[in-house]
Amino acid sequence: MQIIDLGCIPYAEAVEIQTGRVQEVAAGAENTLYLLEHPKVITFGRNGGRENLHVDDSTLASMGIEVAQTTRGGNITCHFPGQLVAYPVFRIAGRPGGMRALFYSLEEVVIRTLARFGLQAFRSEGRPGVWIENRKICSIGIAMRRWTSYHGLALNVCRDVSLFDMITLCGLTDARATSLQAECNDDSITLQEVKDVCAGEFRAVFAHPPVAAHQNSV
């Protein structure tokens, strides 16, 4: 696995990079993990989400917030500086469990990353992503083309998650967003620090995928 740090780039640019790499990985190139941030953008998944947006597009545009329809699974979510985004462009063909196992492994990466900061996070049946009690700290939405994954996860690191106030998070009225800094009550934790830990956990998890990922995918 090669890991590439893209810095903070627009959403559309990241999609273009991923789709280009999908073709290469599907043809035999090395699996690639992109780590990055996005400027403020609200995205909709294949399950919809515009009905869960509480602000019109013109108001968002005046605030410098983009809106984008995507090919990933899931509903509505937000991206912004201070949120760690990870896009795994990985071959799925031949992997035990396929996409469901990949999803489980992505959750595992985040759970282990948060544990390194002293936080106990968990999966919630029927509520994709990673949670701390009823607070969502990480959204996950993936897609597949030519048996290769793209899109991925978004882990809230910095305390300010106010962009989520403009949406019903993933269409769940009882859910609210949280962040690593807020849960640790420590604003000194940097995104780079979390990025480094997350990269290490990606390598560990995908070197030895969790058994439950295979069991849950059949």
From Swiss-Prot:
Origin superkingdom: Bacteria
Entry-linked InterPro entries: aa-tRNA-synth_II/BPL/LPL (IPR045864), BPL_LPL_catalytic (IPR004143), Octanoyltransferase (IPR000544), Octanoyltransferase_CS (IPR020605)
Residues engaged in binding substrate: 72-79, 139-141, 152-154
Pathway linked to the protein: Protein modification; protein lipoylation via endogenous pathway; protein N(6)-(lipoyl)lysine from octanoyl-[acyl-carrier-protein]: step 1/2
UniProt-listed Enzyme Commission number(s): 2.3.1.181
Additional comment: In the reaction, the free carboxyl group of octanoic acid is attached via an amide linkage to the epsilon-amino group of a specific lysine residue of lipoyl domains of lipoate-dependent enzymes.
Protein name, per record: Octanoyltransferase
Organism, scientific name: Oleidesulfovibrio alaskensis (strain ATCC BAA-1058 / DSM 17464 / G20) (Desulfovibrio alaskensis)
